[in-house]
């Protein structure tokens, strides 16, 4: 398969690649670009999981810092992000290996920055260490105790 096709007409490249795979014409495949696409899909799955977790942690921090300002949209956002993670894990069990304490810390640091920017509250007022466990973050019923000290 011409490597130029990938750059010239991506959709046609996809269609041709599918055809070649379905017809076991492996020697005609553009393996270099096919491998890159598969790697990219893997990275995309991890990025989506990370993004959803950041949004969850960000909103949980808002519940802690500004409980009086909570809205239904916060609860809806938490539900939607948790639902996305749940669906991703149901479809790809191996993604669960991405949900580590180390990645929780990384996501928390980004969520902390976002919460500070959105609320206008000094970053130092938010806990340096994540006050939530991974289980709490993913638990559909979990909303931080509004009396919880931070």
Protein language model regions, located:
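Surface/interface-facing alpha-helical segments and adjacent flexible terminal/loop regions used
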Residues: 1-54, 58-150
């Amino acid at each position: 398969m011409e490597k130029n096709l990938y750059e010239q007409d991506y959709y046609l490249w996809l269609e041709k690649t599918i055809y070649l795979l379905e017809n076991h014409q492996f020697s005609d495949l553009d393996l270099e670009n096919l491998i890159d696409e598969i790697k990219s899909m893997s990275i995309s799955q991890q990025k989506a999981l990370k993004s959803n977790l950041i949004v969850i942690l960000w909103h949980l921090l808002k519940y802690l810092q500004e409980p009086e300002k909570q809205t239904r949209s916060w609860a809806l956002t938490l539900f939607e992000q948790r639902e996305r993670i749940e669906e991703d894990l149901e479809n790809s069990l191996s993604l669960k290996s991405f949900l580590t304490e180390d990645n929780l810390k990384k996501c928390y640091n980004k969520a902390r920055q976002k919460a500070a920017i959105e609320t206008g509250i000094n970053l130092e007022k938010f806990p340096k260490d994540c006050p939530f466990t991974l289980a709490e973050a993913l638990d559909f019923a979990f909303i931080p105790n509004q009396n919880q000290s931070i």
